[in-house]
From Swiss-Prot:
Subunit structure: Interacts with CIB1; the interaction is direct. Interacts with the chaperone BIP/HSPA5. Interacts with RIGI.
One cellular component term from this protein's GO annotations in UniProt: mitochondrial inner membrane
Gene this chain is encoded by: IFI6
Name listed for the protein in its UniProt record: Interferon alpha-inducible protein 6
Transmembrane segments: 7-23, 41-61, 75-95, 99-119
Length: 134
């Protein structure tokens, strides 16, 4: 269980750092095109939740097992080669397969919605900072 939590936390950190906006993105948003805070938040949460819920099956971690010729099968192969012929229990591939087999898409959707909310708050705070600088 601890390894699943660590894996999910690492995924969160990876996605959190990728969600930061650049200055060009700030310029793209103008005051006329900005949404209200609530609807903007709902949009980010829906997109984040939808993408994360679809991520496991799209990568090949399905409820029936790892799909052939998918990224999941490549990860499984690399993991087996790196660990002397077997996929380690509790490793990244095993954890993602467990989430895919047990309906972890609902959990991933919740994490994605939380990440969407976090990205929305970052975008909103950066917009406020850029307005204050002007």
């Amino acid at each position: 269980m601890r390894q699943k939590a660590v894996s999910l936390f690492l995924c969160y950190l990876l996605l959190y750092t990728c969600g930061c906006c650049e200055e060009e993105d700030e310029k793209r948003y103008s005051e006329e095109n900005s949404d209200s805070s609530f609807w903007g938040m709902v949009t980010y949460m829906a997109v984040g939740g939808g993408l994360m819920a679809a991520a496991l099956p799209m990568l090949g971690f399905a409820s029936t097992g790892i799909a052939a010729n998918s990224l999941a099968s490549s990860l499984m192969s690399w993991s087996a080669v790196a660990n002397g012929g077997g996929v380690p229990a509790g490793g990244l591939v095993a954890t993602l397969q467990s989430l895919g087999a047990s309906g972890g898409s609902a959990l991933m959707a919740k994490i994605g919605a939380f990440l969407g909310y976090t990205v929305h708050k970052q975008v909103e705070s950066r917009q406020k900072e850029s307005k204050e600088k002007k």
